[in-house]
């Protein structure tokens, strides 16, 4: 779910949203008027196993929307997460996220060193400031790998070593995503930067115990006390061939898409919500 179309207070050099349908001009609708429960049922009936609140921008720019989506989502999903760059997280918001039903917070943090991370992301909190705000929230650290930054197994190890003292035991390292060749969104400054700084090979290949494997290949491993995954997106060609999409994506304008790169993948648009019974969450 992408409640924020494109607003963000940071400027990651590789920003995928700049090369996706999030970059299209579209009018945001008030999600409180939409049939969100109907969308949750639609997604779950088609195999969705977790609710992910992310965005073409920073979701916590709309904290009330995020909390409402989580509260409704816990009626449908056992696993709920939200991606954030951490700039808007406060101790009070962290507690509210926990109370609403968030399972864990995915923190987009792309280098272990504060200065190097700010150089790549255009800002962001220090490690110490973020974890002070996060409090007791379970945090899954998410790092996009890029040459010159976190680019190999040694860099991944240094990243994990820096975050483990703060209690982090879940790590996702992501390949440097670029738009697929036929995409109308290729050629953005961010896409060109990503293409020139690509890291595509799994730095953890052959290590640890494989706990699970996603249908298109990424493996979730246990390495010592940590859960680690090198994640790459499925290609649109793979999704078409296998008739399986990574996710359904509810956009800020109420459109539901099978792909964030193909505007032709619109599945439907949410209608207004029927009134929820008095006293319901």
Regions from the language model: what does each represent?
Residues 35-56:
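Short Fe-S-cluster ligation motifs
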Residues 236-281:
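Flexible mid-to-C-terminal extensions adjoining Fe-S/redox cofactors in radical SAM and related proteins
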Residues 1-34:
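Canonical Radical SAM [4Fe-4S] cluster-binding loop centered on the CxxxCxxC motif
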Residues 22-38, 59-104, 108-126, 143-158, ...:
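Canonical radical SAM enzyme core domain
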Residues 44, 98, 161-164:
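Non-catalytic positions within long, well-ordered alpha-helices that form the structural scaffold/packing
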Residues 2, 51-53, 80-82, 105-107, ...:
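Hydrophobic faces of well-ordered beta-strands that scaffold small-molecule active sites
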Residues 24-26, 115-240, 261:
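Radical SAM enzyme [4Fe-4S]-AdoMet core and its adjacent flexible, acidic
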Residues 47-50, 76-80, 101-103, 135-138, ...:
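Short, well-ordered coil/turn segments that N-cap beta-strands
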């Amino acid at each position: 779910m992408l409640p924020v179309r494109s607003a963000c207070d940071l400027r990651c050099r590789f920003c995928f949203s700049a090369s996706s349908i999030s970059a299209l001009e579209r009018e945001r609708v008030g999600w409180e008027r939409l049939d969100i429960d109907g969308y949750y049922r639609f997604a779950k009936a088609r195999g969705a196993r977790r609710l992910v609140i992310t965005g073409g921008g920073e979701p916590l720019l709309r904290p009330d929307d995020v909390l409402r989506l989580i509260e409704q989502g816990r009626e449908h999903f056992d696993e709920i997460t939200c991606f954030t760059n951490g700039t808007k997280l406060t101790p009070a918001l962290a507690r509210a996220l926990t109370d609403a039903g968030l399972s864990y917070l995915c923190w987009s943090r792309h280098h272990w060193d504060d200065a190097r991370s700010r150089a790549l992301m255009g800002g962001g909190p220090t490690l110490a400031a973020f974890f002070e705000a996060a409090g007791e929230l379970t945090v899954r650290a998410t790092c996009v790998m890029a040459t010159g930054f976190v680019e190999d197994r040694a860099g991944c190890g240094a990243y994990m070593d820096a975050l483990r003292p703060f209690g982090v035991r879940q790590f996702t390292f992501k390949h440097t995503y670029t738009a697929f060749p036929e995409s109308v969104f290729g050629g953005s400054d961010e896409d060109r930067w990503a293409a020139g700084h690509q890291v595509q090979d799994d730095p953890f290949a052959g290590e640890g115990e494989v706990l699970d494997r996603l249908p298109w290949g990424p493996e979730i491993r246990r390495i010592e006390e940590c859960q680690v995954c090198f994640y790459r997106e499925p290609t649109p060609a793979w999704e078409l061939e296998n008739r399986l999409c990574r996710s359904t994506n509810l956009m800020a304008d109420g459109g539901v898409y099978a792909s964030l790169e193909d505007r032709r993948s619109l599945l439907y648009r949410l209608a207004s919500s029927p009134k929820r019974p008095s006293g319901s969450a």
